[in-house]
């Protein structure tokens, strides 16, 4: 499966497309620990908890059952997801953070190329939860990078005003 996604500049919603047809979305509310995602009529909820060492639980919205979890590897831009006792690793594939992969036992199940307002993902699995989770992790690290930039540049900007 090959998906494209787009996100408007100040939007919290990623729209997912398959051959130009909308097939899902990932909605990330600002200042909320809960995000929702849907793909091919399957809906998932992502609940992030913790402060310095955050984790995310993945729920099937229809059954309200926990189907997986995500553990982040700090600022190293790597995450581990677990579904049914199977471990998956999400990681960037280049130093520009414009390509990432979602792997099981060193085999890439999902690969993606990013642009400023979207990207393209190729999935070698029919499990939609893996693809939507990989997109969620990508968004998590983009938000983390933005927060770090704000934390660094606001003091610099404030010092330059004085």
State each model region's role.
Residues 43-74:
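Short hydrophobic interaction/assembly module
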């Amino acid at each position: 499966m090959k998906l494209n996604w787009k996100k408007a500049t100040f939007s919290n919603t990623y729209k997912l497309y398959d051959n130009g047809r909308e097939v899902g979305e990932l909605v990330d509310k600002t200042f909320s620990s809960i995000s929702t995602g849907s793909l091919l009529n399957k809906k998932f909820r992502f609940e992030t908890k913790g402060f310095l060492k955050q984790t995310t639980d993945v729920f099937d919205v229809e059954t309200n059952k926990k189907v997986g979890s995500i553990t982040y590897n700090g600022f190293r831009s790597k995450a581990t997801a677990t579904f049914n006792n199977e471990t998956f690793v999400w990681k960037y594939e280049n130093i520009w953070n414009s390509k990432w992969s979602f792997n099981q036992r060193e085999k890439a199940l999902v690969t993606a190329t990013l642009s400023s307002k979207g990207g393209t993902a190729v999935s070698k699995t029919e499990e939609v939860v893996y693809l939507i989770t990989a997109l969620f992790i990508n968004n998590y690290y983009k938000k983390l990078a933005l927060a770090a930039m704000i934390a660094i540049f606001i003091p610099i900007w404030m010092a330059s005003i004085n």
